[in-house]
């Protein structure tokens, strides 16, 4: 579990498939949040 915290400090230093998947998942969440924020403003 600590590996997740370590990867958070170095998001660009990831080469593992699992870590890469986590990053993509995080990016997806951010995109969804952005869309929700834009929708709320509109």
From Swiss-Prot:
The keyword Phosphoprotein applies. The keyword Transcription does not apply. Keywords: DNA-binding, Late protein, Phosphoprotein. GO terms for molecular function: DNA binding. One of its GO terms (biological process) is viral protein processing. Belongs to the orthopoxvirus OPG062 family. This is Truncated phosphoprotein OPG062. It comes from Vaccinia virus (strain L-IVP). The lineage of its organism: Viruses, Varidnaviria, Bamfordvirae, Nucleocytoviricota, Pokkesviricetes. The gene is OPG062.
